[in-house]
Amino acid sequence: MATFKDACYYYKRINKLNHAVLKLGVNDTWRPSPPTKYKGWCLDCCQHTDLTYCRGCTMYHVCQWCSQYGRCFLDNEPHLLRMRTFKNEVTKDDLMNLVDMYDTLFPMNQKIVDKFINNTRQHKCRNECVNQWYNHLLMPITLQSLSIELDGDVYYIFGYYDDMNNVNQTPFSFVNLVDIYDKLLLDDVNFTRMSFLPVTLQQEYALRYFSKSRFISEQRKCVSDSHFSINVLENLHNPSFKMQITRNCSELSSDWNGACKLVKDTSAYFNILKTSHVEFYSISTRCRVFTQRKLKIASKLIKPNYITSNHRTSATEVHNCKWCSINSSYTVWNDFRVKKIYDNIFNFLRALVKSNVNVGHCSSQEKIYECVENILDVCDNEKWKTSVTKIFNYLEPVELNAVNYVLFNHEVNWDVINVLVQSIGKVPQILTLNDVTTIMQSIIYEWFDTKYMRNTPMTTFTVDKLRRLCTGSKTVDYDSGISDVE
């Protein structure tokens, strides 16, 4: 049973402010949403369950019940999830404001406790203090948070998350910020709250408090393509595809970590709520995470035998060849940019092999084939450079003045010629390892310049950033026929 969810349900009834702030989709009428098998904690209601993707950032962090309100931790509206979200440097004052917000929304005094106990005892057979009947009173104030890093910005989503040892398939990791605050000060806050509870409930409260306030922070996770909506991943092969997201917005102050202070001024809070509206954004899929996914898929479909072949057609246009024909039914080939990169990389590699090694036909079994498997995934820089070095060494370079050279006297297509001229200024007849690396990088960077790409898509930007980019029309990609270089 989700403690935070129960606390919101019961405390929502005590006043007008709580009724507005503690309204959760999981406690209201359920509206169906796409079912998924991603396990983790819903950031909105803090329960561990199956998650669906958020309409604000396309990541999996909301349950199918809470998704009806479309709340995202990156919103610009002072809903409870946003007020519990802190960013980058979190100070002791910020945490004091958070504790004050918890104390305001979930007050614990004799009057409140007696009221909840009396309401519970009106039901049949509920005269005893059983934990499940008073779960809402057993939520301690902790500085437990789920954290994520998105392109240099670190976000902390505070809450009370049960069962921390459960399966977590999200990019969020548990972080404990109690040391920034003060353990003894937080102990005092909770012991005071606990003193109003019946003795039979105090032990359970104490156990929950210490288990959630003394844990060791987890190592931060890396965001990967699997953390985003499957609907987005299935459309990445379309260069003109745009992600459609919605954000809840209002005239909220630019002081990100100060949003939780709004509950101290009820009139100011409701005035800001009056400005609430939804903004829609059309976002490009261009980012390192999605680009690497496409290049990895293409890498699994590589037919390395082409680099020793005599085919007159480009690598993706070879048909009826047992060793060189690719499986064109995969949707990754619908992206003409991936096909261009594949064709030009293998055209260049074939020219290198034909210039330096005596190999006559694509049916021959060569050791160099093993080196070509990772040649498209330039995002994994170390592994990619290792592959290029192995290919270069296979060509049996000649050493001259402490520099190794290979020949380059085989024909290449016009696209590769243009890359040669742009990258090293001419069409050479000998190449160094550095030249080969530069040329192959240029072939890929012409379409996917990963050096200057964001790691995650712009769906993970704050509303302020999205608005600035929208003003300059930069939230959408270039026309599908234009490369990064152009």
Curated annotation (Swiss-Prot):
Kindly indicate whether the keyword RNA-binding belongs to this entry.
Answer: yes
Gene Ontology CC terms, in alphabetical order: host cell cytoplasm; host cytoskeleton
Record note on modification: The C-terminal region is phosphorylated by host CKII/CSNK2A1. Phosphorylation of the DSGXS motif is essential for host NF-kappa-B inhibition.
Give the residue ranges for region: Zinc-binding domain. 42-79
- Region (RNA-binding) residue ranges read 1-81
* Quaternary context: Interacts (via C-terminus) with host IRF3; this interaction leads to IRF3 degradation. Interacts with host IRF7; this interaction leads to IRF7 degradation. Interacts with host CUL1 and CUL3. Interacts with host BTRC.
Protein name in UniProt: Non-structural protein 1
User: Which source organism?
Assistant: Rotavirus A (strain RVA/Pig/United States/OSU/1977/G5P9[7])
